[in-house]
């Protein structure tokens, strides 16, 4: 029983003129969307709802939301707007059964409780929640210096949340998507309040209290049940890895420990599956109990993944492991073996944690890393000469990115802020050399490497392609041309590593070199060649190259046009390359050549590939019209009218080549179809501008 009469206190509080009708956040809709970003849809209870601003915002978003508050005056006012959605109740004894709501929200309420009541309230929030608890709590005193009875920092509040339910079936842990709400770096600057985004633990966790976990904390810890910035750092690495997981990916969490990272990878991505392996049977038992609904866990040595087939894993995450093993090179070679062509490997290691004696004081660390050593091991794992490892497209593993990470609170850089940032590159876009790395404070190194999609001296791959991204409702390749990469490409793995935006290699020089290698070895009448050429054309648009090289690329567009082929994807690249050539000619100042390229782009029937390809032909029509409107308005109108009619024509065609499967439309299909309409709308606006192209060309252009 609390010693504070909260009902009398807050009935009076809400009747004050400066408090009546107020809310603790300026934008209730923004807060509602934050809740939805973490919790998704489902029923929501707002505890300490006040006048109901958040509940009303959630209702407007289509969420089944209700509110409860200790103060009748606030509840009466809220029910006047949404009758029956609010009721009087105490956070210390909520009037709802266990698991009554998918998500329980509590904003700016807990700090108003006496410290002795905090854990009781947290247990109640967890009890009535089925899945999620979303808390915002102030960490500073209120303006009147009387209402905030518990003023503590984030770490204290997190620990209370993690321990409040011990001995019950209502334990809480961090939500795996918590860093998607308040990012790792943003936690340094949260201001006067902090957000705790929590998830209900499985009932089996009752057998695993934190005290039991703390006994092995030096080697294993569930960072979703650990407060503080060091735990934030561990979770941030997995969120970083999640950002490059492609839809449909098979993910391996190597040396997964207690499995929290596997859970983050599964809940923060559209990957198809996550497999966590660890050599410790006890760790795997915990992982299965805690996170078995998200991922599959097996006891296995990451240096011997013989049960994992070659070319079967799309992403391997291996964090804080290489320094623990006697043969890190052997482990890295296993990762390369199991990765698919174009698959990614993400590893992290402590960056030179040696003390004054030159030794790492952590007894479990067998290796000491700096960038030079990590780089060399990655290159050797990819086949480079161990005596003189050097980056090369002939290697099987290419280094794509390098990040540094700081957390603060450790042996070194104790006062550092939370940071994950790319390490500097030089003007040639080469990754930093060791002397430069030393000038940037670093606690951990995070490297991203990509497995080559090419066999040696070839544009092909040794692995059989499997489609996991662009599938229909049954998981098969949909009918039509759009996703027929295995049918049409010499090496369909290039789609992921070279072609698809948001999936392909992110380092410009590496992408450029891959495209050049493909053009060197692929047949000129293949979509592989055409796609590589398109990559280089757009690269030249954003990063101008030597004039002779640009001229060579433009000449290749014409050469490709003479190659005989009925391959639909070859047509796709011919249209795209003529359009890109027009843009490049414009940038180079050769407007006559640009008009000729755009004209050639519009000469193809895009329906032999897909209605979506009309984004190129219609924009080409629009650009052609704009280029000649001042001197030949009638000719410009013909181009714009042709653009409008092209949209009408292609959208009347069979939509199998527009979206694949209407039960599971391809993810890019309807957004690109909307671009067809948008571009046609620009042509229509240009037509309607009429004589304004002569009398007020700036106004005419603004209309489009």
What are these regions (language model features)?
Residues 106-109, 315-321:
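A short beta-strand submotif of the Rossmann-like class I SAM-dependent methyltransferase core
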Residues 119-133, 329-341:
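A short glycine-rich, Lys/Arg-flanked "PGG" loop and its adjoining helix->strand segment in the class I
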Residues 1-97, 103-105, 116-122, 144, ...:
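Conserved N-terminal segment of class I S-adenosyl-L-methionine
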Residues 133-155, 347-367:
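Short, glycine-/aromatic-enriched active-site segment of Class I SAM-dependent methyltransferases
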Residues 599-603, 637-651:
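TPR/TPR-like (Sel1-like) alpha-helical repeat modules
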Residues 505, 543, 588, 630-631:
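Structural motif corresponding to the intra-repeat A-B loop/turn of tetratricopeptide repeats
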